[in-house]
Each structure stands twice: as C-alpha cells, then as structure tokens.
UniProtKB/Swiss-Prot annotation:
It holds the Pfam family Aldedh. It comes from the Bacteria. Belongs to the gamma-glutamyl phosphate reductase family. Its main location: cytoplasm. One of its GO terms (molecular function) is glutamate-5-semialdehyde dehydrogenase activity. Coiled coil: none annotated. GO terms for biological process: L-proline biosynthetic process. It is an enzyme of class 1 (oxidoreductase). GO terms for cellular component: cytoplasm. This is Gamma-glutamyl phosphate reductase. Catalyzes the NADPH-dependent reduction of L-glutamate 5-phosphate into L-glutamate 5-semialdehyde and phosphate. The product spontaneously undergoes cyclization to form 1-pyrroline-5-carboxylate. NCBIfam families: PRK00197.1 (NF001221), proA (TIGR00407). Its EC number is 1.2.1.41.
Length: 426
C-alpha cells in the first residue's frame, strides 16, 4: 500500500470500529460470554493449524537474526494456547460490570446521583512479538463491550492473522458485529502512525512492546495512551527472612522465564542476611547460567561460589531491564535503603519484599511507588491472569485511569447518572 491507501485503509478500520462499538456496548452478557466460550473452543480445536502458522513466523524471525528473547515471545506453544483458552473461559465466568451503577446517593435537592460503568468505546492495541496478545486483547474487548483495532508486529503476522480469523468466527457465532475486533492486515509501519492519530474514531491507544515502540507512541499519539516503558522489577531479601523461601522465590522471580516484563532484574539483599543468602542463591544462579552483576560487597561474598558468573555492576546496571539471564545484585543496609533504591532506579512496575517482619512488609507496601508491590511472593505473579482478571490487555505504570495489570475495569470509564422526579434547580 502507498501512503494514501494506508490512510484510507486505517480510516476505514476506524469508522467500522466506531460503528461496531455501539452494538458491542449494548450486547447482553450472555451474548458476550457466548463469543468468549466459542473462542476458547476454537483455540483448542485449532492448535495444530495455529502452530503451523506460528512456525512460519518463527522461521522468518530466526532467519532475520532476531534476538532469542524476542523469538521466545513469538512462540504459540500448546501451553500458551491453553492459557489463552482458559483466559477466555475465566472472563466468561466473571460478572458483567457494564451498566452497573455505584454510589447512588440522594442529594438535598431530591435528585439521586451515582455513576454507571460503561465501555471506553474503541481502543487501539499496538504490540510486538507475542501473538497471544491478539487473543488477550480481543477477549477483553468483547467482555468489556468495546470495539478494538489490533496492530501486531510484522514478525508475528501469520500467527496474528490466524488468531484473528478465529476471533471473527467466534463473533459471528455469537451474533456480534464482524468489525468489533479488527486486525490491521498490513505490516507497513505507516499504519501505526495513522492509528494513533485518529481521535475521531479511537478513544485510547495501548502499546505493548519494547521501550522504543512505547516512547514513539507516547510522543506521537493524538489520543490518550495506557502504557509502561520498562519492567525493571526488584526482589528485596530482608532481615529477617526465611532464607530457604527467599532462595526459592528469588530463583523463580528471575529464572522461571527471562523475557517477561515482570521478571526480577534486580536483587537487593539486607546486610544482615547477605552472608547466608548470597552463597545459596549464587549456587542456584550458577547452575542455571545466570550472570550476577554485583556491588563490591556482594561480589566479595559471591566469589567463593563454584562456577558463578560475576561482573562488577555499573551505575547503568541498576536501571537495566535485561530480559536475559543476568541480574544486578546489591547489598543494602535494610528496608529503608532498599525502598530508596527501588524508587530511584526501578520502573514502577512490580517489586517484592521477602521478610518475616510485619512492620517492614507494611512499610514496603506503603512506600514503594510501583503498580504492584508484593510480600513473600515472586514478581512473576504480576499478571492479569494470576490476579484473577482473566486476560490482561497490558500493565500500566501510569497513575491515572489504570495502574498495574489492565483487565476489564481498566477498559471502562464511569459516567454520571442523575435520577429525578421533576426537580428543578433554585
């Protein structure tokens, strides 16, 4: 497509989405749930075909020299597809919040005032790699009564097209409009520029991908953006703590999977437990090939660990999102220094404390300025599915509208409802 055709194409998608959004907003819960259950069924019925489409994307990605963490994000394994199907079913089982009126109160004038939860309208989703985002976005759009326009990365085009066909089939089975969920069918980057500049059609943009993509969208968008830039998450091992539990959680937070934005990239250890904890986690990381970039105090303890991969941390390491088997390690005086470090260098995404001290836990929960804060749990739990939201559209580190994993509620807004019996203002 040339520039003119791209503009015409995206405006057509926008108009179709805007038109469909009215019907999506009115759809009864039973109809939306029917579409979600149909989508779950279709995902399970088409695992082999979907993996065939996905294999072509993987082959192209490797041939193009795409970094292994990015290739990993492209994979549509049976486990990934089953998680998507379960997410659809979980959403279908959840109450429909659209149309709920809350906080209704009678005023001295006689009128009653409350707020009704309504869909945002149309959201645009721009994402890289992970084709499962197509299903997560589509299912949340359906449940929340929105229409959406999805623009996946060129590296996942075959997978995204195959998944979008299943979404269209599920919408049709439920009697919902075919344009309720639309995938941008071109990989031309000009389509992104058009999509983020159509406030007449699109109410919010949600970018999900690398820092470069999100910075570009944030700078150029003419509509509101729900986003997070980095996933520089921390695990802080406090004094006192259960050392065995801390080793297990710190291991999971880093090594369960390296590519997600909720993997821990920084490990902070209280000085009082460092000599006991660091050799144990060092041995675990050494066995898994994780490089530890530490402060001088941490390195002095870790050098005695057989096979450990060590490097001296630089200032840049404290802010780095590695998405790889690398973790920064710093010994701190205690909870106050840990909180200060996290708030200075972290990305306000997810941070955890491992402790047996209730007051330290409460201080951490209160003072760490992140979208998710955890006590004695892995940062890998920062996920809409794990939080019981069903699928998630993304994770927001902003403080307005939505913060943390964005599920159904994050794709809605509140409008004021006033009920009267002929009252007039005096």
């Amino acid at each position: 497509m040339n520039a003119l055709n791209i503009a015409e194409y995206t405006h057509t998608l926008g108009l179709q989405a805007k038109t469909a959004s009215a019907q999506m907003a009115r759809a009864p819960a039973a109809i939306k749930n029917k579409a979600l259950l149909a989508l779950a069924r279709l995902l399970r019925q088409n695992v082999d075909a979907l993996q065939g489409d996905n294999a072509r994307d993987l082959e192209r990605a490797r041939a193009a020299g795409l970094a292994e963490p990015m290739v990993d994000r492209l994979k549509l394994t049976p486990k990934v597809l089953e998680t998507c199907a379960q997410g659809c079913e979980q959403l279908a089982a959840m109450p429909d919040i659209i149309g709920e009126i809350q906080g209704m109160k009678q005023q001295p004038s006689g009128i009653r005032v409350g707020q009704m939860r309504v869909p945002i309208g149309v959201f645009g989703m721009i994402y890289e790699s992970r084709p499962n985002v197509t299903i997560e976005a589509a299912s949340l759009s359906i449940k929340s009564g929105n229409a959406c326009i999805l623009r996946g990365g060129s590296e996942a085009i075959d997978s995204n097209k195959a998944l979008a066909r299943l979404v269209a089939q599920a919408l049709a089975e439920a009697g919902l409009p075919e344009h309720g969920v639309q995938l941008v069918q071109t990989t031309d980057r000009a389509a992104v520029g058009q999509l983020i500049a159509m406030p007449q059609y699109v109410d919010v943009i949600i970018p999900r991908g690398g820092k470069g993509l999100i910075e570009r969208i944030s700078a150029e968008a003419k509509v509101p953006v729900i986003k997070h830039l980095d996933g520089n998450c921390h695990t802080y091992v406090d004094d006192p703590c259960d050392i065995a539990m801390a080793v297990q959680v710190a291991d999971n937070a880093k090594t369960q999977k390296y590519s997600p934005c909720n993997a821990s990239e920084g490990l902070l250890v209280a000085r009082g437990v460092a000599a006991q904890f660091l050799p144990q986690i060092g041995a675990v990381y050494a066995a898994k090939g994780v490089e530890m970039r530490g402060c001088p105090e941490a390195l002095a303890i870790l050098r005695a660990v057989p096979g450990v991969q060590l490097a001296e941390a630089t200032e840049a390491d404290w802010s780095e999102e590695y998405l790889a088997p690398i973790i920064s390690v710093k010994v701190v005086a205690g909870v106050d220094e840990a909180i200060a470090h996290i708030n200075r260098y972290g990305s306000h995404h997810t941070d955890a404390i491992l402790t047996r001290d209730h007051m330290h836990a409460q201080q951490f929960l209160r003072d760490v300025d992140s979208a998710s804060v955890m006590v004695n749990a892995s940062t890998r739990f920062a996920d809409g599915f794990e939080y019981g939201l069903g699928a998630e559209i993304g994770i927001s580190t902003d403080k307005f509208h939505a913060r943390g994993p964005v599920g159904i509620e994050g794709l809605t807004s509140l409008k004021w409802v006033v009920l009267g019996e002929g009252e007039v203002r005096t």
